[in-house]
A protein has these predicted regions:
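Active-site-facing substrate-recognition patch
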Residues: 1-28
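PRPP-dependent phosphoribosyltransferase catalytic core
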Residues: 2, 108-177
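Glycine-rich phosphate-binding loop signature in dinucleotide/nucleotide-binding domains
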Residues: 24-28, 83-86, 113-114
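Short glycine-rich phosphate-binding loop at a beta-alpha junction
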Residues: 27-36
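A structural signal for isolated positions on well-ordered beta-strands in alpha/beta enzyme cores
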Residues: 31, 55, 91, 119-121
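Short, structured coil segments at secondary-structure junctions
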Residues: 49-50, 137
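Short, glycine/charge-rich flexible loops or terminal/linker lids adjacent to PRPP-binding catalytic cores
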Residues: 52-90, 100-105
């Protein structure tokens, strides 16, 4: 599968664009919930623009023996979730909407704690058929960019950031097909 690289500058600009759309909407979050680990940095950048506190959840597709699982499961959840989430407007953040199963899982878990409202923000929404479904309770979905179905390489996953950024530069030099 072809790769698509994003730099920290790309991520920052995309998160800023999302924050502007959140502010222009009728949704005003009380808290940001980051899905770890990909949603941590986007959530932190959104906090800069929205000024809201961040909570984090951990979700995995691997069992205790590092074997892949069909569906996601919780590895870390919000301490005192009922107290922190009930009646709140939550902005759920992840880096990419690929299969949508992680988003669906987290939304359903959050709904158990009776929030006033949940909105979703993702940096990138892959243009492909999704396995998961966003529950109808979610009225706002903010995607920074809609991208083709390629392997996305984020800077926080790079072991050599200069090599990563060079790959991004090379991709931008290739004419669009």
């Amino acid at each position: 599968m072809e790769k698509l690289h994003f730099t920290y500058q790309d991520i920052h600009r995309t998160a800023q664009s999302i924050a502007e759309r959140v502010k222009a909407s009728d949704f005003s979050p009380d808290i940001i919930v980051a899905i770890g680990s990909g949603g941590f940095i986007p959530a932190r950048i959104l906090r800069t623009f929205l000024g809201k506190p961040i909570l984090a959840v951990g979700v995995s597709y691997y069992d205790e023996h590092d074997q892949p699982t069909e569906l996601p499961h919780t590895v870390q959840w919000i301490e005192e979730a009922e107290r922190k989430l009930a009646g709140k407007r939550i902005l759920l953040v992840d880096e990419v909407d690929d299969s949508r199963t992680t988003l669906e899982y987290c939304i359903r878990e959050l709904l158990r704690h009776r929030p006033a409202e949940i909105a979703v923000a993702v940096l990138h929404d892959k243009l492909k058929e999704k396995r998961g479904v966003i529950p109808t309770e979610v009225k706002h979905y903010f995607a920074g960019e809609r991208i083709e179905d390629r392997w996305v390489c984020y800077p926080w996953d790079a072991t050599d950031i200069d090599e990563h950024d060079a790959a991004r530069l090379a991709e931008s030099a290739v004419p669009a097909r």
